Amino acid sequence: MDAREIIKYIQESEKKTPVKVYIKGNLSEINWEQEGIKSFITGNTGVIFGEWKIVSKLMEANQKNIEDFVLENDRANSAIPLLDLKGIHARIEPGAIIREKVEIGNNAVIMMGASINIGAVIGEGTMIDMNVVVGGRGTIGKNCHIGAGAVIAGVIEPPSATPVIIEDDVVIGANAVVLEGIRVGKGSVVAAGAVVVQDVPPNVVVAGTPARVIKEIDEKTKSKTEIVKELRSLIEE
């Protein structure tokens, strides 16, 4: 998706505040068959799911029949749902936050705590390590490793801005930051903690703040940054 498509999608999407309510009381007296509410009631206890503006009105109108409740709510007026992970041919660990309209290639790995925003692209065989942030439209190629805590900056506004592009076979070290509009060339390595403020050519190592080329990729560097395919393979039944 380009930036204008994303902006239009967010603007036109229905904003939602979903809630989950554990409820106790004289529940048989309440009409749960209402649009926007799903109820699972057994006797005088149950769980209901729905949009807060609908659920709150129903609960307010039936206060006398409700003895107690506990409400769970994790968002307000949310414009973008999370990505439906079923059917994605990749390893996605618990706690990763991936929004809708993200593309994930086959055999990619998304680790715990990673956050991937709308419009991002994760290439085949790429590993997104723990607590990585991939901003809107961030584009990462095939067989990359993005180290723990790294930030791939996103660009949705201004719409004319170019997103970050990480080409194939790139290794980004832990806690490195790649700023908006930067391209990191194929086969390069960004050292841990580096802040990348200008394009990186292919097959070099950059380090520092701001990041500068310190050497070309050699065999020693390749062995230290080897991508292990076994970590990315999925055993099919």
Curated annotation (Swiss-Prot):
The keyword Acyltransferase applies. GO terms for biological process: diaminopimelate biosynthetic process; lysine biosynthetic process via diaminopimelate. Pathway: Amino-acid biosynthesis; L-lysine biosynthesis via DAP pathway; LL-2,6-diaminopimelate from (S)-tetrahydrodipicolinate (acetylase route): step 1/3. It comes from the Bacteria. Its EC number is 2.3.1.89. Disulfide bonds: none annotated. It is an enzyme of class 2 (transferase). Keywords: Acyltransferase, Amino-acid biosynthesis, Diaminopimelate biosynthesis, Lysine biosynthesis, Repeat, Transferase. It catalyses: (S)-2,3,4,5-tetrahydrodipicolinate + acetyl-CoA + H2O = L-2-acetamido-6-oxoheptanedioate + CoA. The keyword rRNA-binding does not apply. PANTHER family: 2,3,4,5-TETRAHYDROPYRIDINE-2,6-DICARBOXYLATE N-ACETYLTRANSFERASE, ACETYLTRANSFERASE. Catalyzes the transfer of an acetyl group from acetyl-CoA to tetrahydrodipicolinate. Belongs to the transferase hexapeptide repeat family. DapH subfamily. This is 2,3,4,5-tetrahydropyridine-2,6-dicarboxylate N-acetyltransferase. It comes from Alkaliphilus metalliredigens (strain QYMF).
